[in-house]
Amino acid sequence: MKKIVLLMLAIAGIAFAADEAVVNETLKAYSVVAAGIGLGLAALGGAIGMGNTAAATIAGTARNPGLGGKLMTTMFIALAMIEAQVIYALVVAMIALYANPFLG
């Protein structure tokens, strides 16, 4: 742990000595990478959640066909909520890319 702290302190001096233009370009590049990774993970999680929701709805309808209509309604509500989370991740990614508060 002490080695990591010393390494971070040593690197901090280099970061503070860097030119502002270089820091801004590096921050832009890291913002693009972070937005891509974050949006990719959100889409992956959303796809897994939607697949599980659809599978559970199909299984429920197969067990009790009389509840198919209610299950479909509940499934569509759940899918909308799952998709909303992915859209929130997209909004955060757009903020990181175009309205980054850390860029001067």
Swiss-Prot record:
Transmembrane segments: 31-51, 75-95
A Pfam family this chain is assigned to: ATP-synt_C
Zinc-finger keyword on record: no
Bridged cysteine pairs (disulfide): none
Site annotation Reversibly protonated during proton transport: residues: E83
Keyword flag Lipid biosynthesis: no
GO molecular function: lipid binding; proton-transporting ATP synthase activity, rotational mechanism
Major localisation: membrane
An example Gene Ontology CC term for this record: plasma membrane
UniProt-listed CDD domains: ATP-synt_Fo_c (cd18121)
Protein location: Cell inner membrane
The entry's keywords: ATP synthesis, Cell inner membrane, Cell membrane, CF(0), Hydrogen ion transport, Ion transport, Lipid-binding, Membrane, Transmembrane, Transmembrane helix, Transport
InterPro entries membership: ATP_synth_csu_bac/chlpt (IPR005953), ATP_synth_F0_csu (IPR000454), ATP_synth_F0_csu_DDCD_BS (IPR020537), ATP_synth_F0_csu_sf (IPR038662), ATPase_proteolipid_c-like_dom (IPR002379), F/V-ATP_Csub_sf (IPR035921)
Gene3D superfamilies referenced in this protein's UniProt entry, alphabetically: F1F0 ATP synthase subunit C
Membrane topology according to the record: Multi-pass membrane protein
Family indicated by similarity: Belongs to the ATPase C chain family.
Record-linked NCBIfam families: ATP_synt_c (TIGR01260), PRK08482.1 (NF006295)
Subunit structure: F-type ATPases have 2 components, F(1) - the catalytic core - and F(0) - the membrane proton channel. F(1) has five subunits: alpha(3), beta(3), gamma(1), delta(1), epsilon(1). F(0) has three main subunits: a(1), b(2) and c(10-14). The alpha and beta chains form an alternating ring which encloses part of the gamma chain. F(1) is attached to F(0) by a central stalk formed by the gamma and epsilon chains, while a peripheral stalk is formed by the delta and b chains.
Function: F(1)F(0) ATP synthase produces ATP from ADP in the presence of a proton or sodium gradient. F-type ATPases consist of two structural domains, F(1) containing the extramembraneous catalytic core and F(0) containing the membrane proton channel, linked together by a central stalk and a peripheral stalk. During catalysis, ATP synthesis in the catalytic domain of F(1) is coupled via a rotary mechanism of the central stalk subunits to proton translocation. Key component of the F(0) channel; it plays a direct role in translocation across the membrane. A homomeric c-ring of between 10-14 subunits forms the central stalk rotor element with the F(1) delta and epsilon subunits.
Name of the featured protein: ATP synthase subunit c
Gene name in the database record: atpE
